[in-house]
């Protein structure tokens, strides 16, 4: 594979100061090699979470878990995505970004295998936490890798990255149920998803072996200051938190809900796949439509679509579930794409943008982690999922009500 000699890039995350790797000249991988890395790593960042949805009913039956306890299999990884948003950049500064990404991928792959071998509930939850840690650290640092390796193609490469994440989610949602039926064991149906992780590890070592060997400078790191006293920052965090809560609640419980309503595991997996596919398709659509600095109209439109889909599932869950799930996902996917730009719209410098992004991600994933837990608790309390669906409708309505107040900084002056 062709390579060219360029100075090694700096490990840059907005809002943080990173030194370059020691050494003045390191041969960077080709564009094609970078694309391979992006695709394989992105494809492995969601199956460890999404694959649990089609398997929750089997896990509950075998281990005797309550729905509240089972919800932790999705809640724990999502929670760690928020908690590890801040220490991950420090680890990258201390030990090198590419080394930490490799370590995170190894942890992710090992944890998926350990979860398949779990002999107790404690081991199941501990291995799930390790899955979440690997996803959280790799996902947090990988956008920095994309920006560093493709400074002139950031939009294109980030689009490839986001689409590959959605594709990995969709494939896991579609395939996990049939794999479970074929193998007859939920453990190895979940353990199957170590294969993308192994491919990502091999690609990472093969393509980024030079940066993995390069020594790292350890000068001081300037951490960003979070906008704790800014009302707009809290409103953005609230909007993003509502969106994450709805998304992760449905990722965890959509398949079990329809299995409980009489669908087979494969059919329920297809409904979940329509949800992940709708989310993936919304990313480029709303990204292309968003041309104005003031995105409130599109934010309201995406929130309304998400609310309409959730409302349709609550009122008539058996009426065209493939369509209603895709509708809800298209709205949450659009809100996610637009919401990611809001911290940047309200920041005047890269350092400030990093601080806003870290603040929003921390708050939104911590709240989003409560979604699967709340749905599981309401299912245990009520004996059905109907009250949980109405909770998601209420959260979607709150998200819509927040949109008029998400005016960017440039339009407030």
What are these model-predicted stretches?
Residues 52-53, 231-273, 279-283:
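Extracytoplasmic gate region of multi-pass secondary transporters
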Residues 83-122:
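Conserved MFS/SLC helix-loop-helix module at the cytosolic interface between two early adjacent transmembrane helices
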Residues 100-113, 297-312:
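Structural signature of the two symmetry-related core transmembrane helices
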Residues 127-164:
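Cytoplasmic helix-loop-helix junction between adjacent transmembrane helices
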Residues 137-150, 334-348:
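Intracellular juxtamembrane helix-capping segments at the cytosolic ends
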Residues 152-153, 159-209:
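Helix-loop-helix hairpin linking two adjacent transmembrane segments in secondary transporters
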Residues 350-386, 392:
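A late C-terminal transmembrane helix in Major Facilitator Superfamily
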């Amino acid at each position: 594979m062709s390579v060219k000699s360029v100075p090694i890039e700096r490990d840059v995350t907005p809002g943080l100061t990173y030194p370059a790797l020691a050494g003045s000249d390191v041969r960077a991988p080709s564009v094609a090699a970078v694309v391979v890395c992006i695709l394989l790593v992105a494809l492995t960042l969601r199956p460890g979470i999404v694959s649990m949805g089609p398997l929750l009913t089997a896990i509950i039956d075998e281990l005797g878990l309550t729905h509240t306890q089972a919800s932790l299999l999705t809640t724990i990884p999502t929670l760690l995505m928020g908690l590890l948003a801040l220490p991950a950049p420090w680890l990258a500064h201390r030990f090198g970004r590419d080394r930490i990404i490799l370590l995170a991928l190894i942890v992710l792959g090992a944890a998926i295998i350990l979860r398949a071998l779990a002999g107790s509930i404690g081991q199941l939850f501990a291995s799930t936490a390790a899955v979440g840690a690997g996803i959280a650290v790799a996902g947090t640092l990988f956008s920095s890798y994309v920006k560093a390796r493709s400074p002139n193609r950031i939009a294109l490469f980030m689009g490839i990255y986001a689409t590959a994440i959605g594709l990995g989610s969709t494939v896991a949602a579609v395939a996990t149920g049939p794999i479970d039926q074929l193998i007859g064991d939920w453990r190895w149906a979940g353990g199957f998803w170590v294969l993308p992780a192994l491919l990502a590890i091999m690609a990472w070592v093969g393509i980024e072996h030079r940066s993995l060997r390069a020594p790292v400078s350890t000068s001081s790191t300037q951490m960003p200051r979070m906008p704790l006293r800014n009302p707009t920052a809290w409103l953005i965090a609230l909007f993003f938190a509502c969106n994450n809560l709805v998304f992760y609640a449905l990722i965890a419980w959509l398949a079990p809900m329809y299995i409980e309503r009489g669908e087979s595991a494969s059919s329920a997996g297809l409904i979940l796949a329509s949800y992940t596919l709708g989310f993936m398709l919304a990313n480029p659509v709303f990204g292309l439509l968003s041309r104005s600095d003031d995105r409130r109209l599109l934010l309201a439109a995406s929130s309304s679509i998400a609310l309409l889909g959730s409302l349709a599932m609550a009122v008539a869950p058996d009426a065209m579930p493939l369509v209603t799930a895709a509708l809800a996902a298209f709205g949450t996917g659009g809100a996610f794409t637009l919401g990611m730009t809001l911290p940047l719209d309200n920041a005047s410098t890269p350092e400030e943008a990093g601080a806003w992004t870290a603040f929003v991600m921390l708050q939104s994933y911590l709240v989003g982690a409560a979604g699967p837990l709340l749905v599981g608790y309401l299912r245990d309390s009520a004996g059905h999922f109907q009250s949980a669906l109405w909770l998601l409708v209420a959260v979607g309505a709150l998200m819509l009500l927040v949109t008029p107040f998400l005016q960017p900084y440039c339009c407030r002056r």
